Amino acid sequence: MDKDSIMNTLISRRNFLKLSATVGVGMVSARTAHTAPIIPTAQMKYHYTGGNVKTKAYAAFDESGELRPWEFERRPVGDNDILIEIKYASICHSDIHQEKGDWGKMTYPQVPGHEIVGIVVAVGKNVTKFKIGDRAGVGCMVDSCLECESCKNGLEQHCDNDQTLFTYGNPDNREPTSITQGGYSSHIVVRDHFAVHIPENIKLQEAAPLLCAGITTYSPLMKYKINKGDKVGVVGIGGLGHLALMNPLMIFIKIIKLR
């Protein structure tokens, strides 16, 4: 795939995973080692029959950040929602900060995790882009108004109506626990707009880190229209930095590593 083809394909973050699956030097070849199955769901045969979703998880109960097993209920699947049986959830350093209250007072118990992949096991009546059995991923957001100017322009994190819901720790009166709960769990309910399809030729455990770390380093390349011959500085070659270096666009760019 040449540079022009890549640039034409990368018109939105929703094409990101598809590109990573088709370009030989794609980011999934990083084989990131910080994913692990959180709940052994592979043998489960889940059938949603309506009502709240019983969920098993690992949660923080105080600012120690220690995670312990916890069972709770999620809100019912709405008309525009999908229910995902989670297979893998990556560990992001921001999970640790939030669970320890480093960014302000937290509501506990709280289930972290915002790099989530799994299998769709139920869909709302208005959902057309997913069906039961599809492979799906979820990042750091699960809902917004989708009607304001920011949402319509793909900036749901800046929802003008202040209805952005992040994947965990956000107040949500629809949830039995009063807040959103994340991906270190067996299941998650998410508005279909905030889920992406995971291509069949990406291993689920390798796709998970792309839902935050991968997209975080991908987005600025697109926002600033990085082109062949441009110089890009990568500050630190850690969890995000090494994924930045493996972005397919980087084969056309001079890379400056800042340690």
Predicted regions and their residues:
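Cytochrome P450 core scaffold surrounding the K-helix E-X-X-R motif
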Residues: 94-96
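Glycine-rich beta-strand-centered segment in the early N-terminal region that forms part
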Residues: 75-89, 102-152, 157, 197-201
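C-terminal segment of N-terminal export signals and the immediately downstream linker at the start
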Residues: 30-71, 85
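Cysteine-cluster motifs in flexible loop/terminal segments that predominantly coordinate metals
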Residues: 140-193
